[in-house]
Amino acid sequence: MAYSTTADLLERISEASLIQLTDTANSGAVNQTAAQHAIDAADGIIDALISPVYRVPLTGIPRAVRDASATIAIYRLHLYRSVDPGVWKDAYTASMAFLGAVAEKKATLEGTLPEPPASANLDNALSYTAEPRNFSRTLLTGF
């Protein structure tokens, strides 16, 4: 489940701007595939950053995550089209800083409880045992 949609992108930029950023075939319409690729890339970044603290993908999508996903997607679309991202660079930097704070447990996501990653569960920890060494420094002293 994507954290943002094309409609979320259109809440932040005009349809004409989104067409300019996605329409490589000059069809005059939003290229949904290009928009979805940018959203998927943004969601992958978000998942990678918050996975040490939260189980991903998130089931309930907090507003902050939806905003970050849309902001990162718009920024990536600007880079995709080699267009100066302008103010979106600052918004991208702020979103990444927030996600970094979430990863460092300095910020939390509303309505979502932090869950330790599966590797932190010590109930399934492995234990290894071995026979005593046949040859050691003390046994081989004098040879």
Language model regions located:
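Conserved short "hinge" loops at termini or chain/domain junctions
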Residues: 1-65, 122-143
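Ordered, amphipathic secondary-structure segments that act as subunit-interaction surfaces
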Residues: 48, 52, 64-84
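Short loop/turn elements at secondary-structure junctions
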Residues: 75-143
